[in-house]
Amino acid sequence: MLTHKQLELLDFIQKRMARDGVPPSFDEMKDALDLRSKSGIHRLITALEERGFIRRMAHRARALEIVKLPESMERAAEAERGLQTQPAFTPMLIAGSRTEPPRGALPVAAAALDIPMMGRIAAGVPIEAIAEVAHHVTVPGAMLSGRGEHYALEVKGDSMIQAGINDGDIVVIRSQPTAENGDIVVALVEDLEATLKRYYRRGGMIALEAANPAYETRLLREDQVKVQGRLVGLIRSY
């Protein structure tokens, strides 16, 4: 699973290598992704290498090699080369017998909805934002706050434990670009990292506050933070 920026960089590298036969320079990558510094490119390259999509080769200039592409990008590349791709597998569904629920069962399933599980979100030190659907999870319809898109994330870390959010919990997020003071939000920091924190406006700055005294509040400029959604529910497995 890759972030939007990781996908954008991998796509840029793949297209440039197909055209020129060599990878682009770090300056070209920085300009293509509209990043302020090459350090962001280094982090994206490292993430792509750790996930097995590219390989850095020692003692060679512009030493990058594409090992594999995500399925969606591979199909696009094959289409550009004029190759016919195989249709996606469609499973055959067999209807089973319908049984009555056990006595005393809560009528949750009847009002349950599937929402996309988008991967992990940091409740601690920010980790890479996830922008691809991993799978879907079923949640009670009453948990979804009115209209709008919703998605789920697995919590990684302990910075929100005093808000009742533990490592391994599944949080349900309503997708929205704004937040009120005190909301627990998914915040995208500098288009590279995502974190789950309480949101506060302080003058011209944004404070991302943990619910654990072991973590410091982060103060960032408004242009460094994008709200990706607001917490509306939580699922915990025992």
Swiss-Prot record:
Source superkingdom: Bacteria
DNA-binding region boundaries: 26-46
CDD domains xrefs: S24_LexA-like
Keyword terms: Autocatalytic cleavage, DNA damage, DNA repair, DNA replication, DNA-binding, Hydrolase, Repressor, SOS response, Transcription, Transcription regulation
Catalytic residues, chain numbering: 159, 197
Subunit relationships: Homodimer.
Protein name per UniProt: LexA repressor
Catalytic activity: Hydrolysis of Ala-|-Gly bond in repressor LexA
E.C. no: 3.4.21.88
Organism, scientific name: Rhodobacter capsulatus (Rhodopseudomonas capsulata)
Residue numbers marked as site, Cleavage: 123-124
SUPFAM superfamilies noted in UniProt: LexA/Signal peptidase, Winged helix' DNA-binding domain
Pfam families: LexA_DNA_bind, Peptidase_S24
